[in-house]
Regions:
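Membrane-interfacial interhelical loops
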Residues: 30-40, 85-108, 140-188
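Central hydrophobic cores of alpha-helical transmembrane segments
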Residues: 135-149, 215-223, 439
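Cytosolic-side transmembrane helix boundary signature
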Residues: 188-220
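Juxtacatalytic substrate-recognition/specificity segment
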Residues: 39-40, 244-362, 373, 380-381, ...
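Selective transmembrane-helix segments that form parts of the transport pathway or gating/packing helices
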Residues: 61, 68-93, 467-469
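Long, hydrophobic alpha-helical segments
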Residues: 21-60
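Acidic/His/Gly-enriched intrinsically disordered linker/tail segments
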Residues: 143-146, 185, 314-315, 337, ...
Length: 730
């Protein structure tokens, strides 16, 4: 093959310049890329690495023995234009068409994008020195190899985050909105700069050397690159199986699982329960999927979201890697997420491709099966949540949902619930074997002998006939959020909110007030509004907090955050001696009934208003232990079941206190309505945590006397099944 000589095309730099201009004009019309931010900088780092490398080869072909600095001087004007175009377009887009702050974008651009252009030049020059033919092809192969190294790390390593010479850093999922310039990113970029600077000197050194010398240095460069890849885990730029096990520090082996968990998790009874829950869910999922394998699942349990972010990459998302037979969950959410992630892992036995999932990598199929087998959304079967959405007018087109990556076009709970409910319908009506076949081949006609339209019509007829009381406020609570693509300045807001929260936790309320106010002015997020109001209250600016919140709360009507804000506003009214306004708001919240937890909190406040308004004002500032004692005192004469879940929530970090609370209510619980049933359900869960399995069973049995809610009754039955299984195991 004869190399295509781009050096003879004098307009080549103009072509690249035009391409950069055109691509950036397209980028600013794409969600998450339309402002000067992290994603915009990453996209342009890839573009400028490629452009600067190609330009270097084009120029070097005309001046074959030119030094690195000579090449830089000859193309410096083009390079300035290359780097300026994205900078100018991104900056103008942010300044004239957005209210987002540009500071973060500037920092990312100079730490991620500008170095990438330099690395492209060095790579292009080094290739010109080492190779005499096929330079463009070799550069493109090198570019793709460097760019897609993270695919290998993602596949083989227990991690989601990536450090890469071209795009710097990627956190792994879209669910973590906060991405900031960390010390790790800066140190990684400095090492990149050192390496590519040395490579530039090596290129100059090799200009007049013989072929054998060049080959030796090429080998040395490749060896150094390999060494760096191997030591990345020690530098915290990647995570391997062994490094993750070492960092977590503890392990537990059960019949069906090998669990590696954080050494910060100390409670032996909770660790024991964690192991039993792994085996119970394993057997449940295996039976429903009709699987025969007895292979052990490897589970990594992180102490909290922050540890998960540091070691694994994703703080918010719990993840399974079916092809590795591994699950990654934080301790605070494992009871909710474990069964779901276990479905992903066990489904690998009938999955397709190297990733052991759906053939087309369709997230609606992958998550739909997991939701259907888990069949628990906020302690209700998944059909319940789907019906709540359906009756409230929150609907999806299944044909669209199961096409490509449209799963991510909706707020996440909408996609998860509908995909899960639809799969649950398919399992119940067509059998698990046909669903497993579809999971593998993604062909409705082959698996079910019907197309998606016919199956969708069947499913929605089924859903419409379910007898569930319509509750639009519950629908808003469940489904009233926004995807990251529809939020205003999500990256900047998340990063600044984290800083503001740090000020708040350190007691610097003046600074937190200023920063939360700034964030709310451009992003109008719930987190910034809540933080601002709480900061104002800490500064005793209660009237200002009331005025601001009563005006701004209207903007959140219809969102999942509205009910939290109603509670907060009622508290502000109470502090400002506006009892009538507070009671009116609490009555409204009870009537809306978005969730029993909100109703419980409203009833607690109404009871305390009747008893002692001044004590209630003090209650808001009490420590957890004092709140527990005060609420327990209120239960001495009569049991107020609406207080029990909150008492248990306050007690969860103190096992001794939790045990005393459980024992106090042990002989007093009488289930006669939903409030007492829900309290009993929470008490049975708490008894499990402290290792009192007999008491857990007593509470669970009592809850079954409440049968007015057939969907919640299924949850109560499942709760008792698990507790019986634990007791039998003991």
């Amino acid at each position: 093959l004869k190399e295509f000589k781009l050096k003879n095309i004098n307009s080549f730099p103009s072509i690249i310049t035009t391409a950069i201009l055109f691509i950036n004009l397209l980028l600013i019309n794409i969600p998450l890329l339309k402002t000067f931010n992290y994603e915009y900088s990453v996209a342009n780092s890839i573009l400028l690495f490629l452009a600067s490398g190609l330009l270097t080869i084009w120029k070097n072909n005309s001046y074959n023995n030119a030094s690195f600095l000579q090449v830089i001087k000859s193309i410096k004007n083009y390079l300035i234009v290359f780097c300026f175009i994205p900078f100018a377009i991104g900056l103008m887009s942010s300044l004239f068409f957005s209210i987002c702050p540009v500071w973060n974008g500037l920092v990312f651009y100079f730490i991620i994008t500008i170095p990438a252009a330099f690395f492209g030049i060095v790579t292009g020059k080094f290739i010109c020195v080492i190779f005499e033919k096929f330079r463009y092809l070799i550069f493109l192969i090198s570019f793709l190899f460097i760019l897609f190294i993270p695919v290998a790390e993602f596949y083989f390593n227990p991690q989601l985050f990536f450090f890469n010479p071209i795009f710097g850093y990627f956190s792994g999922t879209i669910y973590d909105e906060e991405i900031s310039v960390s010390f790790l990113l800066i140190s990684y970029r400095l090492l990149n700069i050192i390496f590519f600077t040395l490579l530039a000197f090596v290129s100059d050194f090799l200009l007049t050397k013989k072929r054998i010398t060049k080959n030796i240095f090429l080998f040395i460069v490749l060896v150094f690159t390999l060494i760096f890849v191997l030591i990345k885990p020690a530098l915290h730029y990647s995570t391997t199986y062994s490094s993750l096990i070492k960092n977590l520090g503890k392990s537990l082996t059960t019949e069906h699982s090998v669990i590696f968990y954080s050494n910060k998790i100390k409670d032996e009874k909770q660790i024991k329960l964690m192991g039993m829950m792994h085996d119970y869910f394993y057997e449940q999922v295996k039976d429903e999927l009709k699987q025969k394998s007895n292979r052990k699942i490897i589970s990594f349990i992180f102490f909290d979201e922050e540890e998960k972010r540091k070691l694994f990459g994703s703080a918010k998302a719990n993840v399974s890697k079916p092809w590795l037979n591994q699950i990654y969950i934080d301790f605070n959410s494992y009871t909710r997420a474990l069964k779901h992630e276990m479905v992903h892992t066990l489904a690998s036995e009938f999955g397709a491709t190297l990733f052991k999932i759906n053939k087309n990598f369709n997230p609606s199929v992958v998550e739909g099966l997991a939701m259907a087998i888990e069949n628990n959304f906020d302690d209700y079967p998944v059909h319940y949540a789907a019906k709540i959405a359906y009756d409230s007018g929150i609907r999806v087109q299944l044909k669209k949902l199961f096409n490509g990556i449209n799963f991510f076009s909706n707020y996440s709970t909408i996609s998860y619930v509908y995909a899960g409910s639809f799969f649950r319908y398919l399992i119940d009506n067509y059998g698990i074997e046909k669903v497993k076949q579809f999971y593998k081949n993604s062909d409705f006609n082959t698996s079910f002998k019907k197309n998606i339209d016919d199956l969708g019509n069947e499913y929605f007829r089924f859903l419409s006939k379910l007898n569930i009381k319509k509750n639009p406020d519950k629908a808003k609570l469940y489904f009233g959020g926004k995807t990251i693509f529809k939020k205003i300045c999500p990256r900047s807001a998340a990063e600044e909110t984290k800083r503001a929260m740090n000020y708040y936790k350190k007691g610097n309320f003046s600074q937190s007030e200023k920063l939360f106010s700034k964030i709310y002015n451009y992003a109008e997020t719930y987190e910034s509004l809540s933080g601002l109001i709480n900061s104002l209250m800490k500064l005793n600016k209660n009237l200002e907090a009331e005025k601001f919140l009563s005006r701004e709360i209207k903007k959140f009507k219809g969102s999942s955050y509205f009910y939290n804000l109603e509670l907060t506003l009622s508290d502000v009214y109470l502090i400002n001696h506006k009892i009538e306004s507070a009671e009116k708001l609490l009555d409204s919240l009870i009537a809306q009934n978005p969730h029993i937890e909100y109703v419980n909190h409203a009833l607690i406040r109404k009871m305390m208003i009747r008893n002692d308004v001044e004590k209630l004002k003090v209650f808001f500032r009490m420590k957890s232990i004092d709140k527990i004692n005060y609420l327990m005192d209120l239960n001495q004469k009569d049991i107020h079941y609406f207080t029990v879940p909150y008492i248990l929530e306050l007690s969860k970090t103190d096992n001794a206190k939790l045990k005393s609370v459980v024992n106090y209510f042990k002989d007093k619980l009488k289930v006669n309505d939903f409030f007492s049933c829900y309290a009993g359900f929470k008490l049975s869960n708490a008894a499990l945590v402290i290792g009192d399995y007999n008491t857990a069973k007593e509470f669970a049995v009592k809850t079954l006397s409440y049968k007015d809610d057939e969907f919640f009754y299924k949850t109560l039955v499942n709760n008792l099944k698990f507790i019986n299984w634990v007791n039998n195991l003991e």
